[in-house]
Amino acid sequence: MAGGHVAHLVYKGPSVVKELVIGFSLGLVAGGFWKMHHWNSQRRTKEFYDMLEKGQISVVADEE
């Protein structure tokens, strides 16, 4: 009677290449989101100063 063999998972340790790829990918995604935030902030600031220059808005409170 031959007993069946059960496959056991063997922990080989961390995969350096896999860790580097995951870290690089997460860094690129986080950097992309940061750049999008920065571009949006720049656009809003530019729009504000353009409107201020055209006289559409004012930073001085109106006296009533």
Curated annotation (Swiss-Prot):
InterPro entries recorded: COX5C
Keyword tags: Membrane, Mitochondrion, Mitochondrion inner membrane, Transmembrane, Transmembrane helix
One of the record's GO cellular component terms: mitochondrial inner membrane
Subcellular location: Mitochondrion inner membrane
Function: This protein is one of the nuclear-coded polypeptide chains of cytochrome c oxidase, the terminal oxidase in mitochondrial electron transport.
Family membership noted in the UniProt record: Belongs to the cytochrome c oxidase subunit 5C family.
Name of the protein: Cytochrome c oxidase subunit 5C
Taxonomic source organism: Ipomoea batatas
